[in-house]
UniProtKB/Swiss-Prot annotation:
Pfam family, one: SMAP
Keyword Nucleus included in the entry's annotation: yes
Species: Bos taurus
Stated name of the protein: Lysine-rich nucleolar protein 1
Annotated positions of the Phosphothreonine modification: 304
Amino acid sequence: MITKAHKGEVGLGLPEKKKKKKKVVKEPKTQYSVLNSDNYFAEVCPRATPPLKGVIQEQAPRMPLVKKKKKKKGHSTICEEHLEPEITLRAGRTERSHSPRTQALGLSKSLSAEKRKSMSPGSRVKTSPDPRQDEEVTRVGKKLKKHKKEKKAKEATAFSGRDPWFCEAGNTVYTHSVGKDGVREQAALGQKQKQGSPREHSVKMKKKKKIHWEGDPPLGHPECSWSLESSPTKGSKKKPVRVEAPEYIPIGDGSRASVKKKVKSKKRVEQADTEEPALKRKKKKKKRQQSEVAEEPWEEEPDTDLEVVLEKKGNMDEAHIDQVRRKALQEEIDRESGKTEAYDTKKWTGTQFGQWDTAGFENEEQKLKFLKLMGGFKNLPPSFSRPSPTVARPSMALSKKAADTLQRNLQQDYDRALSWKYSRGAGLGFSTAPAKVFYIDRNASKSIKFED
């Protein structure tokens, strides 16, 4: 490991620049060498960052020791315990090195230890043998802290545009991202930004610490806004204004929710008001319909023209039966019951022979001859002189034209049946010989005779 101790002599209140060469001493790995490494402090303290400057110009005057105690009260005791042996080793070794590059690298690593020494005032008093060296170390630690926090604020602005989760873990990400090249670049930035009064540095440090000490915010986005607003410019003494975004957001949401609730309640009231008259109307309509249904049977008046002779409950079409059928039914009932005297005076065109009376004959003699052959005059009833009421609508016999059509249809049916009998083999893909002639002969036999 490379170790060094930086000393600066102050004469007549004016700081002087002195470059002292340090020797590179390789030590075996011990408990103290492990503690001196930067990775160890990055793992133990997540807020710890690598040094920002390799070369420091000691231009700031001495700072009182009272302010140092106020700054870091909340520092972890773990860092204090591990820093005490480290500082005692580095204070005792004031050897000189001959190469400037090793001096810059050793200075960058030793500044982290000196910064932690300034954070723990108790350890500084116990282990520092030279009071001037202690004061210079505290000044260096303060300046380093200021530049580190400014760098953090700048990187927080860059990370906030990319991802809000980087803002919450900005400190831990930054500890692993800075390398040897970052140390050299930050040394140049530190020389430019270091030209300022010590009071400005102390004011900035206090403001930043107050912002960080006031507790972790509930969300990652408000923390990004605080880091952006709290990063001061050069020479600015204005207090950082912290915008408390999460306090205003729920208030706005509550007002919107209240407005929505009011609108919903108004709509519900209006719907209830509109539903009540609608229900009343429906009830009135139901009452009217029930009253009309009750009044309908009383409104029906019997028709004087229609006389219902026979009514059946199951047959609703019985009331619409024509009068001719009604009379026929009534006559049949009267005849079966023996009430036939009322029909004696009436004249009937039909006779008792049924449909044979309607057949077309050339003269009356042919008709009588036909009826006698059919046995129409046998077993005549005693009331032959008057016609029977059953022949009121007799079934009519076929006329001459209808008889001819019926004869023709019967002949066609017979011929079709005969053709089916002799063409049994006929079907799809089979046809009989057209010249074949069939003869009916009783003497013909199907056996073949062989003549010798």
